[in-house]
Amino acid sequence: KVILNSGREVAADTVVLAIGVVPETGLAKDAGLEIGETGAIKVTADYRTSDPHIYAVGDAVEVYNSLTRKPAKLPLAGPALRQARTAANAIYGIPGTNKGVYGSCAVRIFGFNAAATGLNEKTAKANNIPCDSVYTMGMDKVGIMPDSSPIHFKLVYEVPTGRVLGAQAIGRGNVDKRIDVIATLIAMGGTLEDLK
């Protein structure tokens, strides 16, 4: 059971406490590095900080969201690894490109797989991107496969262009494959027409 601040008790089999991630920027502040509008360390496309001799990567840095075209926080291991490679290449003088992030992620919890990429409706609207969404339920494999499983899938797109902005999926089967396809479509600037 859960006991609320009001004293009210709520019966529950499982409780998930999700408190978010706050970047640890104390050392950066002490070093005089610029902190961005998100509260994370402001960096260039090659992860150089406001001190040209210091690079920063990972949960403590701002990333460029390719869809909102604004700085964002993205505390995920995959992007942090790519950031480290980009910074290492820059240190060694190897040119590279950083097109930003879409925020693709996947997790398995309580026997379900969930994955997402791009923007959800709330984030799109908060960034004044006119959008709508479509919800569908399909199977993770061809329906005649004996181990196929339903997937709940939501696709977010820009109105009126139809540009794909993001997707979320959940199910017991392989949802990440569907999200990978949408992430590729987003990277290509794809629209609903491209999904036909």
What are these regions (language model features)?
Residues 63-64, 95-99, 193:
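Glycine-rich flavin
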Residues 71-75, 90-117:
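Active-site-proximal substrate-binding core of FAD-dependent oxidoreductases
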Residues 19, 110-117, 126-196:
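Flexible, glycine-rich terminal cap/loop adjacent to redox cofactors
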Residues 88-95, 186, 190:
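Short, hydrophobic alpha-helical segments
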Residues 34-38, 94-105, 130-134:
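A short alpha-helix-loop-beta-strand transition element characteristic
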Residues 2-3, 8-89, 181, 185:
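FAD-site-proximal beta/loop scaffold in flavoenzymes
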